[in-house]
């Protein structure tokens, strides 16, 4: 049990929102956090496509399977970016977006992990060097693992989507 004083020493209330409705505030904040996290899966590196980066590293000799995987991530990233824009427009128009943040957060973090996995694999064992030619790539790749925990784990996001978006039973 945690005890929080009702007021600070300067007399300002410690209560955010309504008393005994703290979970409502927490859910709102998590939704906001998830929306921000979801954007990470839609970015490209320095404005260049994943396929272009990987092709350069392979000296133009990227195999077709790897090229197809890179293009799938790029196409999925574009689809998520467009979906995020649609939900943003809906929110600005005063329409509810439901539990879209859970879906977008899950898809965004998974795409981010896929993108970094491909970039690591294209660099071979050299990409694992912490201070090597690939710069922050190893740290960025490891960071993607934390993204799937922030704002609610991927498993929690899948549970929210299955129950509240798709209406599936527990």
Regions found by a protein language model. Name each.
Residues 2, 9-11, 108, 154-155, ...:
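Short, glycine-/Ser/Thr-/acidic-enriched flexible segments
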Residues 20, 50, 98, 103, ...:
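Active-site lining segments that contact anionic ligands and/or coordinate catalytic metals
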Residues 27, 47-55, 71, 81-88, ...:
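Predominant activation on well-ordered alpha-helical scaffold segments within soluble catalytic domains
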